[in-house]
Regions:
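Nucleic-acid endonuclease domains
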Residues: 1-154
Length: 154
């Protein structure tokens, strides 16, 4: 994946990137379609964010993916896809799982999020959002697809 380098972190600001991704002999279109799935794209984006935002360190810990250097700020990277964005703990998301809203809200209030809009992959929008703001605006721990422009509004 090729991407712009060395960007300072600002909250509630969109960072727009156009990525180039390839894998073996797969067509560019096939790779792009695969990387519109947040479950797959997240693994690459988590690592790339550390490169492009040098203030971040990738840690892949329980409940968060990055820490901000020289601080105690924790971040969880989440993908916005054709089904929207969910910011409850990963252990609460998926078939047969249930969200404990009090626990999810408590957790979200202790960390911040890196929302990555991959709907138009290879175009990706990245936005740093405070967890407290997400809980206040989206208490269901879900940003629906039709709220996409609301989340990424400047």
């Amino acid at each position: 994946i090729i991407w712009r380098l060395d960007v300072d972190i600002e909250y509630n600001k969109n960072y727009d990137f156009t990525l180039q991704a390839s894998f073996g002999d797969l067509t560019k279109e096939t790779v792009q379609e695969v990387l519109k799935d947040g479950r797959l794209a997240s693994h690459f984006l988590e690592r790339q964010l550390e490169v492009d935002f040098p203030e971040l360190t990738f840690v892949n810990a329980k409940g968060y993916d990055h820490i901000r250097k020289n601080s105690d700020i924790l971040y969880d990277q989440k993908c916005f896809t054709k089904t929207g964005l969910r910011f409850a703990l990963s252990s609460m998301i998926g078939t047969g799982r249930k969200i404990d809203y009090s626990e999810a809200h408590a957790h979200a209030k202790t960390i911040d999020y890196i929302a990555c809009d991959i709907v138009d992959f290879p175009k990706v929008r990245v936005r740093f959002v405070r967890g407290t703001d997400l809980v206040e605006k989206y208490p269901s721990c879900r940003v629906k697809f039709n709220q996409r422009e609301d989340l990424f509004a400047n």
